[in-house]
Amino acid sequence: MEVKGPSGRSFCCESEGQFKSCLKRHTPSLLLPSSWKGNSGSCLMAEALHRTSPTPNSCPLPLPLCRMSGVLCSRNLFTFKFSLFQLDSGASGEPGHSLGLTLGFSYCGNCQTAVVSAQPEGMASNGAYPVLGPGVTANPGTSLSVFTALPFTTPAPGPAHGPLLVTAGAPPGGPLVLSTFPSTPLVTEQDGCGPSGAGASNVFVQMRTEVGPVKAAQAQTLVLTQAPLVWQAPGALCGGVVCPPPLLLAAAPVVPVMAAQVVGGTQACEGGWSQGLPLPPPPPPAAQLPPIVSQGNAGPWPQGAHGESSLASSQAKAPPDDSCNPRSVYENFRLWQHYKPLARRHLPQSPDTEALSCFLIPVLRSLARRKPTMTLEEGLWRAMREWQHTSNFDRMIFYEMAEKFLEFEAEEEMQIQKSQWMKGPQCLPPPATPRLEPRGPPAPEVVKQPVYLPSKAGPKAPTACLPPPRPQRPVTKARRPPPRPHRRAETKARLPPPRPQRPAETKVPEEIPPEVVQEYVDIMEELLGPSLGATGEPEKQREEGKVKQPQEEDWTPPDPGLLSYIDKLCSQKDFVTKVEAVIHPQFLEELLSPDPQMDFLALSQDLEQEEGLTLAQLVEKRLPPLKEKQHARAAPSRGTARLDSSSSKFAAGQGAERDVPDPQQGVGMETCPPQMTARDSQGRGRAHTGMARSEDSVVLLGCQDSPGLRAAWPTSPPQDHRPTCPGVGTKDALDLPGGSPVRESHGLAQGSSEEEELPSLAFLLGSQHKLLPWWLPQSPVPASGLLSPEKWGPQGTHQSPSAERRGLNLAPSPANKAKKRPLFGSLSPAEKTPYPGPGLRVSGEQSLTWGLGGPSQSQKRKGDPLVSRKEKKQHCSQ
């Protein structure tokens, strides 16, 4: 027979007595070893928990994890009895703090191995074990290996409750590790917090050997009976995630109100034992007791720190020192996930959160063992102080552990998203994962719904069932701290928190609300005005259906011949100058000015006001600014050219006067020189030209909308269309450049061609009265009347033309001659002739120049004979 100690040493026992003596001799060292050295198979928590060296007499905490191995032969029946050390109030600080027991069984040939592990009670993690009594007696049977724990009295009051039943199958060839007592709460306090050991327990172990495969395995029954326990809230011990407020761990008066029946089953698998497999058959009914349901607290029990403290989690568990068990690693991983919020709360901006969470796992467990009444805040404060006093070299083990846990977490997220992606085509919502700590907002579930355009206030609907993109595995390498043990600075592990990737959402384009469209239409109508259709009705009526909208086929393009004719006219320079002659000079000046802020509306209003003015009011309005411009822009050379042109027009005008009989012809002959009595065809042509240009000047300067001046038109004789003096009313008198000798000859040469173009230009000249509403009327009013308002009668009608002629035939005054010389400079030879015609011409021209014919208008008038041709044609027909 062989007994193995915790250090791996073997003790040979040849007989039952020697085995008992070995047990007695090695029991203190087995339960409370003087030292603990973690081997390669132990986990980090085991190393942290076994840093102290307790002694049998004084038991400082934390208590170590112990293991005792013994070889029991089924052929030799013997009974051994050993006592577990139960701490008193002086050693532990809390009465009733006892040890737990873990029995492991294995079958090798005809031998069975029982592995007994002891661990202190009071842990909230998976390593918590109930109380084992001070005495255990094993009585193996002849045909059935039975370990019977003899009952004994317990100091704690309370009703007796039946034994707990744990049934398991022991396969041949592999160890069966069972948890002696489940971690499910058995007895609760009145406030639902904390257990403490209340007495001893009786353990009934019934075993039988399995023969054959696992399916035909013979049942082994382990009946465990224990005294009442007081369960402590796991959330308060393990990080405060479930129960954030600090919970007192003090032991309360034992009130046994619940005795649970737990059946934990495990089944052998390759590489370990799996959880959640079918349970073996239950024990005989005689060994079972109905559960007693608590009347004061029938609600759900709080989740443990690792989320496994439930009936389903009370199946077989590995011994605490078996660190290579995947189940213990998984539970530590869940503990680490729950400790991270606590670490972030104390180190919000530190990258050591993951490593600190790993450090809290053994520290909080040790503190819970040592002082169950310690609050959560006090435990965290002690843990943080211990972390600050830990060197970088000692922290390395926790950084490595955090690195592995980060890899587990990333792999878990990837598996969850992969499962969602696999279930995406079927459009089934993914099952809820048992994540106790939410890491960001959950991904929205993809539901297959028909695509539709939502209303204005309706929610958006997902359009299709799209699989979420496969996330990339984040890099979880932690930067190790520098090997500087003398520095106490915290080493920062650069571990970026993984971000959950959301599946792509297909957005449905929003429909434009009709209210917005109507508002846009109203704004455009307000800016552009209501559009009129071909029938002249507003656009609103057409929208209402009152007026039918014309079809696009009804629209006819303009005549291409007309367009080509307009292009041909615009290509001619003379046509362009003729069109410029009918444009208002002020409008043209404003249009050509470099000022970009030209107000067309104000200009149009000003022109409309001038349209309603009389001739005298118009002269009074425009005379002062024209005088200023005339002084600034007049040039002597231009005056000489105008005088020469006036002399030639004077002779042409006299020839026209002699050609037409008139009662007042004598008066006209007296005012004209005798050299111009003879005439020829050239003179007749000049007479007609002079008359036409005179009429042209009157048309361009006239305001036919004036009612006072229109009244005088029918009373005048037909011959009054011709001026009585060549210098009166001519274009040169108005200081227009069209009367120069060069322009006159050009007009004579182009006379016939222009007469042919007049009918085609009627559509362009039809609106000349609207464009030029401010000039003189188209009546034979002499230019001298512009500055002589006294010649108008009391009724607004003009005096007789003969009186005007007699007034104009008077000799020029010296004042007029004085004004002429500084204005025009030297006189031409034609002006020095003794006849008074040129003098009168200069006088009339001077008065008109001071009146309306400023030099500013000379730059914009180049082709005025356009309208005069029409008047010339009418005169020839007479």
Curated annotation (Swiss-Prot):
- Residue ranges with Basic and acidic residues bias: 537-551
InterPro entries given for it? NUT, NUT_N
Q: Where is the composition biased (Pro residues)?
A: 278-288, 427-444
* Coiled-coil blocks: none
A Pfam family per the record: NUT
Question: Its family?
Answer: Belongs to the NUT family.
What is the protein's given name?
NUT family member 2B
Organism source for this protein? Homo sapiens (Human)
| Gene it is expressed from | NUTM2B
